[in-house]
Amino acid sequence: MLQIWVKLCLLALLFGAGNVSAQQTVTEAKIFLQSSRLAGFRYYEGRKLWPRMQLKDNLNLVREADNTYDTNAVRVEWQGHKLGYVPRAENAALARFMDRGQHPEARITALSKEKRRGRWIEFDVYLSH
């Protein structure tokens, strides 16, 4: 959470403290929240979709507040297909943002296949401001 606060302060200094002239406008700034490895990939639709997924593809994050296993659950989807979840150890702050009406964006940053561990997806999460 401190990392996010520091980034917000830096953005305020850059964009709100006179560094932008009256003629310039800032339309959108993206604030990096976290990088995560998808949890539960092998249990959902990821295996059959793997050949179609590409780096930089958008992912949809869906809050599951009523999830019986994790009250902070955030489901990860690709083109309407469930791939898995944001890992439990990394989802609390993201869930709070979503509960406050924020709509974080996510993009695939790595599609890897390791011999011992199988296929996995890594993704970054941002908030647009």
Stretch-by-stretch model annotation:
Residues 2-11, 16-129:
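Conserved active-site motif detector
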